[in-house]
Amino acid sequence: MDLLNNLLIGFQSAVTLTNLLYCFVGVSLGTLVGVLPGMGPVATVAMLLPITYALDPSSALIMLAGIYYGAQYGGSTTAILVNIPGEAAAVVTCLDGHKLAKLGRAGAALGVAAFGSFIAGCFATVLIAAFAEPLTLVAFEFGPREYFSLMVLGLVGAVVLASGSLLKAIGMIFISILLGCVGMDVNSGALRYVFGVDELMDGLDFVALSMGVYGFAEIIRNLDAAGSREAVPAAVGKVLPSAKDLKESAGAISRGTILGSLLGILPGGGALLSSFASYTLEKKLAGKNARPPFGEGNIRGVAGPESANNAGAQTSFIPMLTLGIPSNAVMALMIGALMLHDIAPGPQVMTTNPSLFWGLIVSMWIGNVFLVILNIPLIGLWVKLLRVPYRLLYPAILVFCTIGVYSINNNPFDIWITIGFGIFGWIVNKLGCECAPLILGFILGPMLEENMRRALLLSRGDLTTFVTGPISGSLLAVSAVLLLLAILPSVRSGREKAFVED
């Protein structure tokens, strides 16, 4: 009965004209940035953070969430039609999706992707609703040492599951923790890393950093790598998949949904890891006798990954909503949005702001319905948007970013910080470093330090307090095992292969 009462609270919050509008705006923007190669949900959410300051917290979170899971839908469109993933998680969809388009079956591929995404999204939302309250009750048992260990696990997970070099991911985490130390120490009042700059006394602004690393850097990166795009196929064909397509895809959709739902909860997991894991699983299950072979237009190569990335995108909200721990860069930005509204992330959100908590969960069901409507009947509109020249798109984004950053504190210094981090983000990207650990570390670093200090204060400086507690010790043990496994040569080579196209 408690779950039904909570869902009723959620429906009362989500099914209002204002929140329905923001849900629709969010999923529409998400589909748009998913369709347009070079954009993505992280950059878009970062750019829209300043706008959310003027919105009701529920409306803001509903819109930002819609952008994230909406982008997973839209990313498949460009992957199938032009062989360019609009969103990173859609990389593997290119392998079979575009082959199907070349065979004149683009409509079937798009239809299966949309239906698989809808089923996975609805299932994942049910999981969030079912497990949110039990996990939140467990989180209330957490003290400073448990939170410290949980944040260590979050940072280790971000390192282990980040694409590319393990050492580079660790380096990005250390840099982000140092950046989180900038400003006045709240305990001692000492100034750290301000270098005589008064504007840095309050620390680096999260919006400026995230918008620089993802907004400005993304523009520089795409202009630097500007190239020609393949022509969009002239005819998409019938969008609704046939009964045969649905029958062939049913198993892949089911497996992708379950796999994505589980992997989405992991720190650093989410949609990207889920889609790669699903494609690998389907390929292994089919074996060498698959007809057609994977990579040559097998519908399961579209159904599995698209279901997995949507399920993973939505279950990644579980640790953010229940524990206040972001599992990926978008969730870190969502926590930033909560902080903008003076809402402390963590298990107390469900008790102090139940309409926000349950309204967000219910809005995901509504958003999935909106996305089916947007992605099947309006496919022709998204195809036309693929022809928008980048030289017109990026100046508008640049102006929007600048206005957004300035509007938070009305401080020109924030614009310089954004430009600086834009250049920094572009440089580290050129060096093969992923920026997601930087955002996660910047959010978790200060929380890690604060909980470590509290735990040591309560234990009178006894460092063994972190390993003597059953929950804290277990979390640290899991972190150590994950790190050791990632260092092993066989695991490391498998990890690197997971993020490379076959």
Model feature map: region roles:
Residues 1-58, 139, 191-298, 383, ...:
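Helix-loop-helix hairpins and the membrane-proximal interhelical loops
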Residues 68-80, 86, 297-323, 327, ...:
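A structural-propensity feature for long, helix-poor, extended segments
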Residues 33-42, 80-91, 123-127, 263-273, ...:
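Short helix-coil transition sites and intra-membrane helix breaks within transmembrane domains
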Residues 111-227, 340-494:
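Membrane-embedded alpha-helical modules
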Residues 58-62, 99-116, 288-300, 332, ...:
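Membrane-interface alpha-helices at helix entry/exit sites of multi-pass transporters
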Residues 69-74, 115-127, 179, 300-317, ...:
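Membrane-embedded alpha-helical segments of transport systems
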Residues 41-51, 64, 79-99, 130, ...:
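Re-entrant/interfacial helical elements at transmembrane boundaries that shape
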Residues 27-41, 71-83, 158-163, 258-267, ...:
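Transmembrane alpha-helix interface/packing and boundary motifs in multi-pass membrane proteins
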